[in-house]
Amino acid sequence: MRVALYIRIANDNTGDAISYQAQELRRWSNEHGHEVVEVFKDNAPGVLAECFELQRLLAQLDAHTFDGVVVRGLNRLARSYYDFPQLADKFQKAGVKIIVPYDTDDAF
């Protein structure tokens, strides 16, 4: 499956969080036979409107350049339970899967 990785930090105290997430998700994708075709990285926490890479990802959904988006946790993709249904609907309409490879506590 062709996948994109979406990486976002949870707070300003990042350290190597972005690099770690990218390595972790790329490794998982490769181990499961997925081809990583794009990586979207939002380097600052913030509201969805400020997540420019997420907005770029959403704009590419209908282009079908990837079949799934791998994220560390649903709380990386959406800022709250209220935001998630709208995002999930966009992914579903485009036929793109949201893939969360690890059992996470997706506290928003």
Which residues does each PLM region occupy?
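Short, structured surface patches at the beginning of a domain
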Residues: M1-F108
